[in-house]
């Protein structure tokens, strides 16, 4: 009898232990840490989040946005998906991919500026030309940099009959604007344009205004196949001199290239002039600028411009007349 009681107690303890184990939630997997040189991602943007003293680096991931976080720009945790486009995001127009995400903190909210690509053809198509399709920049909003991000509408923030990409935020005299590219696929000579936004960035408040054509830059190489001029990735920075600088990308004799346009008036409306010499010519571009928590001006771009693209960070100097690279920011060697 005693043996049966002991066996029964043992069985009960095993069952209770199994029940307790089943009710215990699994331990969270430790965050994956990866060093900057080992990250493979293009069209990157880094937001120094003042609230958390954390750097958020975002980039495209299929129909979503990937994010890494870091405290030192060397060791990064991630990636994690902070946004994934639902099947019906643009109604009956399927989203194929997301390009060039940017994250901005503005008036207590976090915003993603995204380019959505589709295969939905416009009525007008050209012979021996790439498909002219629905493609546009759109603003999403969240209360935190990790989301959830929500759209204001089920279509591009910019006019839906324009092929637009690489939208970025610029605030001048308290007024928000989107600066973006009107794609060469639609107009042959790509442009950089701007449009005023509503105060909550939910929609445009006016019509787009052209700032310059790609062909305005003497360093830009016209496409031999299409005879076009590409404009990519505008990003703005107010110089200590009061001038307004815009870095942007296209192709030159050496590959993907980052150039700089300058508004001597310091105003977004310009007029804009193109610096003859680009600031980066080693097959890298789609750059943006940010300031570290200790006050250093940095530029991040992707290079090379192909499947092996990775983020590269450079320390910059604002001379008052232009921007120039002083050195590449590199991760210290591991012991």
Task: Go through each PLM region and give its residues.
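Carbohydrate-active catalytic/glycan-binding domains of CAZyme proteins
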Residues: 23-335
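Bacterial N-terminal signal peptides that target proteins for export
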Residues: 1-9
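Bacterial N-terminal signal peptides
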Residues: 8-19
């Amino acid at each position: 009898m005693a043996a049966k009681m002991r066996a029964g107690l043992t069985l009960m303890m095993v069952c209770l232990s199994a029940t307790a184990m089943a009710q215990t939630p699994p331990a969270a997997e430790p965050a994956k840490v990866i060093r900057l040189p080992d990250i493979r991602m293009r069209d990157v943007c880094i937001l120094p989040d003042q609230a958390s003293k954390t750097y958020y680096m975002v980039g495209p991931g299929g129909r979503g946005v990937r994010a890494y976080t870091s405290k030192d720009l060397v060791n990064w945790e991630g990636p994690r998906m902070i946004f994934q486009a639902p099947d019906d995001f643009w109604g009956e127009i399927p989203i194929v991919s997301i390009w060039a995400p940017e994250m901005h903190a503005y008036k207590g909210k976090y915003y993603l500026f995204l380019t959505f690509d589709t295969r939905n053809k416009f009525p007008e198509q050209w012979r021996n030309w790439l498909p002219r399709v629905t493609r546009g920049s759109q603003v999403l909003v969240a209360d935190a940099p990790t989301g959830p991000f929500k759209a204001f509408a089920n279509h591009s923030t910019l006019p839906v009959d324009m092929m637009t990409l690489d939208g970025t935020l610029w605030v001048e005299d308290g007024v928000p604007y989107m600066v973006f590219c009107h794609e060469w696929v639609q107009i042959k000579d790509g442009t950089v344009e701007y449009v005023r936004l509503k105060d909550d960035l939910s929609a445009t408040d006016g019509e787009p205004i052209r700032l310059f054509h790609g062909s305005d830059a003497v360093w830009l190489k016209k496409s031999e196949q299409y005879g076009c001029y590409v404009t990519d990735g505008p990003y703005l920075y107010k110089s200590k001199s009061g001038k307004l600088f815009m870095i942007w990308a296209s192709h030159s004799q050496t590959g993907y290239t980052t150039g700089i346009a300058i508004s001597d008036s310091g105003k977004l409306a310009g007029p804009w002039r193109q610096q003859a010499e680009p600031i980066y010519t080693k097959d890298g571009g789609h750059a943006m600028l940010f300031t570290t928590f200790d006050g250093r001006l940095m530029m991040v771009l992707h290079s090379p411009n192909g499947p092996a693209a990775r983020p590269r960070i450079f320390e910059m100097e604002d001379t008052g007349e232009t921007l120039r690279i002083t050195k590449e920011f590199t991760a210290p060697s591991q012991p």
